Amino acid sequence: MGRGAGSTALGLFQILPVFLCIFPPVTSPCKILKCNSEFWAATSGSHHLGAEETPEFCTALRAYAHCTRRTARTCRGDLAYHSAVHGIDDLMVQHNCSKDGPTSQPRLRTLPPGDSQERSDSPEICHYEKSFHKHSAAPNYTHCGLFGDPHLRTFTDTFQTCKVQGAWPLIDNNYLNVQVTNTPVLPGSSATATSKLTIIFKSFQECVEQKVYQAEMDELPAAFADGSKNGGDKHGANSLKITEKVSGQHIEIQAKYIGTTIVVRQVGRYLTFAVRMPEEVVNAVEDRDSQGLYLCLRGCPLNQQIDFQTFRLAQAAEGRARRKGPSLPAPPEAFTYESATAKCREKLPVEDLYFQSCVFDLLTTGDVNFMLAAYYAFEDVKMLHSNKDKLHLYERTRALAPGNAAPSEHPWALPALWVALLSLSQCWLGLL
């Protein structure tokens, strides 16, 4: 942002979307994120807000406030909503905006001629691999993927099946944040799948502006939340780019300035996520104590893990598709163990953990799209994983006792950050 009358206000809204998007309400009908996106689209091109532009900014603020009022009934108690309302009031005061006046819908920022999407002369710092010329060794890449019921492959090639209902951080480092929201596949079931995905690319030097990407069930956009397809107006903006591979089903995001490739798919009703990222970027965190708070690095909390291998063995022994234990209700009888294995073998001939995940998902959901999710997840591994000898992962040779969760070195305590956020939410509500 430039130094203008609105620099302080716009600085606030550089931070606010990160906070709002990383910690949204769980499966809430509140539409505050839509209001945020509309406001950003209306104001993101205003690098300098002089006095002559203040009326236009006030119009955008009134439209923002009007949007929040329309969704107020469904946002009661929502931290993101109350934070936005409080921020709007502050900006109204700072810019001497009247609450009465035009509230036309925010206009989408149009890209100028010769937009940076066409630039190929990005600075070297905006190309991660080129910047490695000063190092003796090439970067070491890692992979993380989330798909299906959901199944997680971490940056360290640990494979887990998790419940993790609600909003969970997948990645959180100095360059980007990724959060998923998982919802129950069947009413009353502990089996969940990813219904929403938010990716925040943080502003980086002369390369990219902050960009937010959001996908939900039945909505896989081929653009960022502000309508753009690259990193904005900076000289190296072409180092961040979205490409649509299959309309409404498959997009790829290239973030060359951090050597990162992200693949997002919609398979059936649910989303899958896969990323290739340098270890240096994975470990780039300011607070080392909070490094373990995201799933791609440390995996799921112990109490959120499902021992699907024991479940699979139980189904094979009984010869019928039926969950064991009070926390896993009976699924539709669409597949037996034999028919599920036969179906999965059509796409996944190697009986590795992707194959076993496929069988598990068919037995627990009866939805054949979960077979495709496992298949595409493995296809993404083949494209993104740097070690071709580690594409297939297999179950442990040591069997787990029925009812035991998958092993973990340390059970998780409630992260201190979440406790702080809970306290903060109470503070906001007390002020409003």
UniProtKB/Swiss-Prot annotation:
Domain of life per record: Eukaryota
Region Disordered, residue ranges: 99-122
Residues that make up the propeptide removed upon maturation: 30-149, 405-432
GO CC, alphabetical: plasma membrane; side of membrane
Glycosylated position list: N96, N140
Site annotation Cleavage: residues: D149, P150
UniProt key word Hydrolase: no
Topology in the lipid bilayer: Lipid-anchor; GPI-anchor
Keywords: Autocatalytic cleavage, Cell membrane, Disulfide bond, Glycoprotein, GPI-anchor, Lipoprotein, Membrane, Signal
Record note on modification: Autocatalytically cleaved at low pH; the two chains remain linked via two disulfide bonds.
UniProt GO MF annotations: coreceptor activity
Compartments it resides in: Cell membrane
Signal peptide: 1-29
Disulphide linkage map: C126-C207, C144-C296
Biological process (GO), any one: BMP signaling pathway
Record has Membrane as a keyword: yes
Residues bearing a lipid moiety (GPI-anchor amidated asparagine): N404
Family: Belongs to the repulsive guidance molecule (RGM) family.
Job description of the protein: Acts as an axon-specific repulsive guidance molecule in the retinotectal system. Repulsive for a subset of axons of the temporal half of the retina. Provides thus positional information for the temporal axons invading the optic tectum in the stratum opticum.
Record protein name field: Repulsive guidance molecule A
Species annotation: Gallus gallus
